[in-house]
Amino acid sequence: MSVDKVREYLRSYGLEDRIKEFDISTATVAEAAEAVGVIPARIAKTLTFQSEECGCILVLMAGDAKVDNKKYRARFGVKPHMLTHEDALQYTGHAVGGVCPFAVPDSVPVYLDVSLKRFDTVFPAAGSAASAVRLTCDELERASRSRGWIDVCKGWEEDQ
């Protein structure tokens, strides 16, 4: 089970006790926000994009953010193309709805969008479509082994 793999991975950071599992789906931002009891913007959604270099990249962003094609192209040099559900599972080891930056192969680069920085804590998935993990942005950056903070989103508001 993917959530067990994530729990074991987060143990090395002392964060395994932050995982919450639910009896209801957390596969969408709205479902996760309801289950966790926070505004949707605090859900850190993980999107999987095609990469000619390594097959896949992960970008985590606030639940209210949307990818800005121009910003994405400026950052990565290509138009953003989401992976299929099958490819997302193949590259990350997590099924869509539970995709997260934890316990993914080292070859998969992870980036964090600045839309997350306005919150003290955020809630990415933890490997299943019925889980979440509460992390500060610093903890998320460290545990995801992020390659850094980027600005590729639009539609979010700084003061939420």
What residue ranges belong to the model's regions?
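Extended, low-hydrophobicity, polar/charged segments
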Residues: 1-160
